[in-house]
């Protein structure tokens, strides 16, 4: 691990301040550091200095790389938000920049191994909290007995957890894009609260308290889901961003399947309460590790801190940063508009966003519905034990991993290499893969439903579930990247915040009616066939959405006031 990771970690920052800058000092605080002339108090700008800074600039340069962005969670965007090569002088202010294009303090200049380790940390963080969504579901029967409640009420803690991490990005995403807060402090503080919340969740003795605690748990679990993609974008070059996002999102997509796997073992060996003690342990381990090893990567925050250090060293109050200037121009009214109103406005007014939100919400909901459907067949028909049921969820993980190994080389061929050759690439380059994903999703649902009967082997439904998961992964990756490439950087955060909220609210209610849907359509020979077919026919119709984007994408973007 590089020294920089410890220095810029949460513990490193605290130690730096408590020691009054004695430990974990930065390069500009070294005695042999040569202060650039422009930061000196008696420096006078010349005509050689460009004295204007345009923070509203949204064009993409001739390299195909954008100059800034705002990102959200599950915010899979292909817009680079870390290019801070703005001009150095703004009137009487001196704006701090990186020390050259190859400045090692710029996260985008880190060596590949450091970037890989950072992405691993974000992915592990995402997995360690995201598995908490469905971790208790194998113990629902025991929960129903302990609290004297029905199945629908026992499913509410899952519903409220999902709603919680849909609401969270409305609060935490704007904070993570503010230079004062940055990414790491948000991750660490909310993760600490998530860990603490697992203790009363494991001890609570009534369903009302459990529901409240689960909502709060989802709320504080949301930053890594909402901002993880933005953190990846901080360190990965624009042309490699889809690959970096795919690597991170493996943790995001596989996490909910790991939950029931571990939850089934813990429920059998102990009780449903131990699923939350497990979450406390695994997220607590993540908290301790990240406190020491997760560095800050948001460019505006790093330059904001650098500006403070340079002001202290030089005594020059003219030194400032882009983030400080933006904060001085942002009113509370504008903050409320950006945070609360604009995501709703874009969802309603933008057909592209609305259609993608509906499609992704449906796909997301189907994955959560599996937590209700698997027990109907594997326990009710094939008489699997609870632990054996938990292992069936690994079929979803296998399907996602296979899809990732196919997706990454394809996207490098279709996106990364053309960008490096300085060829023009349009957002619609992602859509053919989304169409393939839609076909796999629909096919998997029919395979799962009609192979899950009383006479066939149980491997058939698992193959169908893996196929469904493969399609879902491809749809997530491509449509998120399509949105990230289609909209102006200023609106990216709102676009993804709307998607977070929309898909989470829709997905949260699916488990409530999932079991009744399949029970009412079941036949003695085919217990889940017609329920799966209903979902299959819906997703078959929805394949028309990416087809529409492929055929009319440029026209739709041309009509939008938010799109590039």
UniProtKB/Swiss-Prot annotation:
GO terms for biological process: response to antibiotic; xenobiotic detoxification by transmembrane export across the plasma membrane. PROSITE patterns: MFS (PS50850). Residues 60-101 are annotated as: Disordered. It is a multi-pass membrane protein. GO terms for cellular component: plasma membrane. The chain crosses the membrane at residues 116-136, 153-173, 184-204, 210-229, 241-262, 274-294, 358-374, 393-411, 431-451, 457-476, 489-506, 530-551. Keywords: Antibiotic resistance, Membrane, Transmembrane, Transmembrane helix, Transport. InterPro entries: MFS, MFS_dom, MFS_trans_sf, Multidrug-R. Residues 67-88 have a biased composition (Low complexity). One of its GO terms (molecular function) is xenobiotic transmembrane transporter activity. The keyword Membrane applies. It is found in: Membrane. Probable transporter. Confers resistance to benomyl and methotrexate. Belongs to the major facilitator superfamily. CAR1 family. This is Benomyl/methotrexate resistance protein. It comes from Candida albicans (Yeast).
């Amino acid at each position: 691990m590089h020294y920089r990771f410890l220095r810029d970690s949460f513990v490193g920052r605290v130690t730096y301040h408590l020691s009054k800058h004695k430990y974990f000092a930065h390069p500009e605080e070294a005695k042999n550091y040569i202060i650039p002339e422009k930061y000196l108090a008696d420096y006078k700008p010349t005509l050689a200095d460009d004295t204007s800074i345009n923070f509203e600039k949204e064009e993409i340069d001739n390299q195909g790389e954008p100059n800034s962005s705002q990102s959200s969670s599950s915010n899979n965007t292909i817009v680079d938000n870390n290019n801070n090569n703005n001009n150095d002088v703004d009137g009487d202010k001196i704006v701090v920049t990186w020390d050259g294009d190859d400045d090692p303090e710029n996260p985008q200049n880190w060596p590949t191994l450091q970037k890989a380790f950072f992405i691993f940390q974000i992915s592990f963080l995402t997995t360690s909290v995201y598995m908490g969504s469905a971790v208790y579901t194998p113990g629902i029967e025991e929960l129903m007995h302990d609290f004297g409640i029905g199945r629908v009420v026992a499913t509410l803690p899952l519903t409220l957890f999902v709603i919680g991490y849909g609401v969270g990005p409305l609060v935490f995403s704007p904070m993570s894009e503010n230079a004062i807060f940055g990414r790491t402090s948000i991750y660490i503080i909310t993760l600490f609260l998530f860990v603490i919340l697992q203790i009363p969740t494991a001890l609570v003795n009534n369903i009302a308290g459990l529901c409240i605690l689960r909502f709060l748990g989802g709320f504080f679990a949301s930053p890594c889901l909402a901002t993880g993609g933005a953190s990846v974008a901080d360190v990965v070059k624009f042309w490699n961003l889809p690959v970096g996002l795919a690597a991170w999102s493996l943790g995001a997509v596989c996490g909910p399947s790991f939950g029931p796997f571990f939850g089934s073992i813990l429920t059998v060996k102990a009780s449903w309460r131990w699923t939350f003690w497990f979450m406390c342990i695994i997220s607590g381990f993540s908290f301790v590790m990240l406190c020491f090893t997760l560095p800050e990567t948001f460019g505006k925050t790093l330059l904001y801190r650098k500006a403070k250090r340079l002001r202290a060293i030089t005594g020059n109050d003219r030194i400032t940063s882009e983030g400080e200037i933006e904060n001085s121009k942002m009113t509370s009214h504008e903050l409320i508009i950006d945070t609360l109103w604009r995501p709703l406005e874009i969802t309603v007014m933008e057909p592209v966003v609305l259609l993608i939100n509906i499609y992704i919400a449906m796909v997301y909901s189907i994955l959560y519905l599996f937590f209700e459907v698997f027990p109907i067949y594997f326990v009710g028909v094939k008489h699997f034990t609870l632990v054996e049921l938990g292992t069936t969820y690994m079929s979803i993980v296998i399907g996602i991993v296979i899809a990732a190994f196919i997706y990454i080389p394809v996207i490098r061929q279709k996106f990364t290499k053309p960008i490096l050759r300085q060829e023009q690439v349009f957002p619609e380059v992602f859509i053919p893969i989304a169409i393939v994903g839609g076909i796999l999703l629909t096919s998997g649902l029919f395979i799962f439903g009609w192979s899950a009967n009383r006479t066939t082997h149980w491997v058939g439904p698992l193959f169908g579930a893996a196929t469904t998961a493969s399609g879902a992964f491809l749809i997530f990756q491509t449509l998120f990247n399509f949105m990230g490439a289609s909209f102006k950087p200023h609106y990216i955060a709102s676009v993804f915040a709307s998607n977070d909220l929309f898909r989470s609210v829709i997905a949260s209610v699916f488990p409530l009616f999932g079991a009744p849907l399949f029970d009412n359509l079941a036949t003695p020979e085919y217990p889940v066939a017609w329920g799966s077919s209903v979902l299959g026919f819906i997703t078959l119709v929805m394949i028309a959405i990416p087809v529409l984007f492929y055929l009319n994408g440029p026209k739709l973007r041309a009509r939008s006031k938010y799109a590039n």
